[in-house]
Amino acid sequence: EQEPNNTFYVLDLSENPDDIDGDCIVCDQYVQESLIYIQKDLIEWNKTYYWKVIAYNNNNESNIIGTSSFNTASPITNTTTNVYENNFQEGLTIFGSFFDYYSAVIDEGGNEIWNSGDQDLIFYNTDKYGRFFGAEFIGNNEENNYPGIKFSFENGIEWQEPGTNFIHHDIFQLPNGNYIGLGTSNNQGVIPLGPWTPLFQALGYEADGETIEFNWMGDKIIEWDAETKEEIWSWDVFNYFNMEDYDSLGGIWFEAYNTGRFDWTHANAIWFDEDDSAIYLSSRHLNRITKISYP
């Protein structure tokens, strides 16, 4: 915190609480125009650091702020990084690991510089304002155990939807302040004829392309009120797509034999066009992008 009537500050940082000046790793660091100092190279994981700041006023009189300390946690990723200097761009890379329940940030050199720690936060996407969106894993005992969230480095979870659906791939904040996400929906459908037919018939299904007997999983776009978290608008593929249009070539019905449900649409992105008041839905298993009128 800034001290009044001071013109500049000098920072010392050490791992030795008894001799911060003499055993410093950041020594006599001059800080004037900003109260922010970013050290990119000398801070390591699993360490305790001690710091003090000397504030100087216009008369060159000093006042010591501190001593204080902070801890760094443990790294969470276990990766090997190959750096191609001619190809990389400046900046940081944030990613989420869905089945390991964490998010992390790496710098240009592949060094892990932040992670979600003991919060099981999974990064999905960001927006032009730099806000982060994703999901939180809340345990296997919940029916919908990945509620969609907005989160930040500083505060962790800042908003969370009510958890009445499985929110996957995409969630973000609309210009009106509400949140919109990509969930799932289910309906009963046929098992169409194909090379998988004997497999399903061996399980006791008719599998004749006519009998409504098998679980189809589709996608549902959901908008929540930012304050009440009430679902105020939705769009479901089962209300608009023809179930006779499905992928018969990609092996999805063989996967359905093992999982007990047909992954019909498998959407992996939604995008909002404010100028056109429209939502674009990318349905991977239908090889289709759909433009949807938004109220």
Model regions: which residues?
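Histidine-/acidic-rich catalytic cores in large beta-rich domains
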Residues: N57, T67-P295
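Conserved aromatic anchor
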Residues: E1-P4
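Recognizes extended acidic, P/S/T-rich segments that occur
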Residues: N6-N46, N58-G66
